[in-house]
Design a protein with these regions (language model features):
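Glycine-rich active-site loops that engage anionic ligands at enzyme catalytic sites
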Residues: 2-8, 12-254
């Protein structure tokens, strides 16, 4: 990876270049790429782990995303210059791992059960028709992929997973739902996710997951983190209910 000097304001990125820019009085953003890629995601994970160790008590928060890391630190204990040095050091560690047999399958493997059905996924049938597939084929394709957690947001526990097989990729709904149920498994373009709470949303709903994706009373509060791998496993209606799932909040097809 090529390295550029620390820049105090936003700058252009080039392929395979690490750029560090100021995000606020006590925060920096490290950009590794402009695209989504499993190798980049693995490097983000390694850098995040290294920064947690290197910055220790100076660190307030680390927010990794698809191809960047936001580093928020205590300005009473350190400064932009010291933190930027730590970022470059973390990147070099990631590169050393890359020179060997770099593990793009790093992170925990998390299995999430899903009740796939037109009852639990009101957009499942329409997605299948648009893709020229059967409902059964859509389900099989969706659960055949090992997804990477690329980012967490827009709500706590909302994990952006990629990449969905292009055969079942689907555009967002023209009119978003006012109410998407907690646990809804959804697709938007080549991303998939599980809604952690009831909220508005414009993704295509294909099933329901009974696993709680965010619980502030538990440690950790989420079953997944950035860099983890996720596989979905189909379960029956009865299994879904036995695991605590509920069906009464699902709105109809758009």
């Amino acid at each position: 990876m090529k390295y550029v000097k620390f820049l105090p304001r936003k700058s252009l990125m080039s392929k395979n270049t690490l750029t560090v820019t100021v995000a606020g009085e006590n925060s920096l953003i490290a950009y590794l790429s402009t695209k989504t890629d499993p190798m980049i995601a693995a490097k983000i994970q390694r850098m995040t782990e290294a920064l947690r160790v290197n910055l220790k008590s100076c660190l307030i928060d680390l927010i990794p995303s698809y191809a960047s890391i936001l580093v928020i630190y205590n300005p009473l204990l350190t400064d932009h210059f010291a933190v930027s040095k730590s970022i470059y050091a973390a990147a070099q560690l990631a590169d050393k791992a890359d020179e060997g047999a770099f593990d793009t399958a790093g992170g925990a493997l998390v299995k999430l059960p899903v009740y796939y059905d037109v009852e639990s996924g009101p957009d499942l049938a329409g997605l299948a028709v648009n893709a020229g597939l059967t409902v059964e084929q859509v389900i099989a394709i969706h659960q055949s992929v090992e997804y990477r957690v690329y980012a967490i947001g827009f709500a706590p526990g909302f994990a952006y997973l990629g990449e969905v097989d292009e055969r079942i990729a689907a555009s967002r709904l023209a009119t978003p739902r006012q109410k998407v149920p907690k646990g809804a498994v959804a697709i938007a373009d080549r991303q998939t996710a599980v809604y952690p709470a009831v909220s508005p949303g414009g993704w295509n709903l294909i099933g329901l997951c009974p696993t709680l994706m965010f619980d502030p009373n538990k440690e950790p509060s989420m079953p997944v983190k950035t860099g983890d791998r996720v596989v979905f496993e189909a379960i029956s209606r009865e299994e879904f209910i036995d695991l605590g799932g509920q069906l009464n909040d699902v709105e109809g097809q758009q």
